[in-house]
Amino acid sequence: DSTAIILEEGVQMIPIQTPKGEFKVFTKRIGDNPTMKVLLLHGGPGMTHEQYANFKDYFPQEGIEFIWYDQLGSAHSDQPEDSTLWTIERFVDEVEQVRMALGLNKDNFYLLGQSWGGMLGMEYALKHQDKLKGLIICNMMSSLDEYENYAKKVLGPQMPKEVFAEVMEIERKGDFENPRYMELLGEHHYPQHVLRRPPNEWPEEINRMMSQVNPNVYVFMQGYSEFGITPGASLKGWEIKNQLKNITIPTLVVGATHDTMDPKHMEWMSKQVTNGRFLLCPNGSHLSQYDDPEHFFPGVIQFIKDVDSGDFGK
């Protein structure tokens, strides 16, 4: 019942105009700070804000306001069945409409995105950085071809030889319905590179998010593969390496040693943007807020406060 949702404290269902009509997206504001408001862009595409559930254990005591948000197509927002909506440009426009509805501006608006959310954050900044106070790019490279290369040449071979061979064979055949695929990755890839805990110890909210991913969005844009972007998926070949220099606002790039994304590339990105800082999570992987919170949160919080106080870059 949507009326009940609207009554929950901090929740705002925001109407979004699209080429296919109006839809509503879920946001939930936690805290209140006139100069530090962080909008969180989840990954996937098609995952949920629960990727950031544990931010509530770190940001409020620092006085930082943050906003959980499910992008269009995700579990707590409307889920139109129209694949023409799943483009980077339309998602950028959606973020801009959310920004306006929440009253965020260059005096208070920080954008944090992880994985696909990082991609969306960079694309948003390239178009609308005059609205931003700071940008935080977590666990996302600036070239999907280079990500693919890293996954196949560096991460894959870390698996037992026969396991990687079997995974690659399933990929070659496009046999992604095969339960063996998830079985092998669940044992040999996710606990090493996505969230470094045994699968039976993954946080409930992350399991819930994984079970709620919208395949209509995820598969259309990124495909089934965990070793790159499936041919035919709409994000194939995406890259903005050469445009990073055009991002001039204060930018934090967060990498992790065990990530699916190459931390060396992430560090390089922090030097390509005009005004960057790099944060490494040495114990972390793709969801480093969960497997390396000891480095992730102090580093992110310090960046937000340094930008706010004017100390960033001094």
Specify the residue positions occupied by each region the protein language model found:
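N-terminal cap/lid segment of alpha/beta-hydrolase-fold proteins
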Residues: 2-24
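Conserved HGGG/HGGXW glycine-rich cap/lid loop of the alpha/beta-hydrolase fold
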Residues: 23-79
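Active-site loop/oxyanion-hole signature of alpha/beta-hydrolase fold enzymes
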Residues: 68-112, 116
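Flexible "cap/lid" loop of the alpha/beta hydrolase fold
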Residues: 135-176
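Alpha/beta-hydrolase
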Residues: 165-245, 249
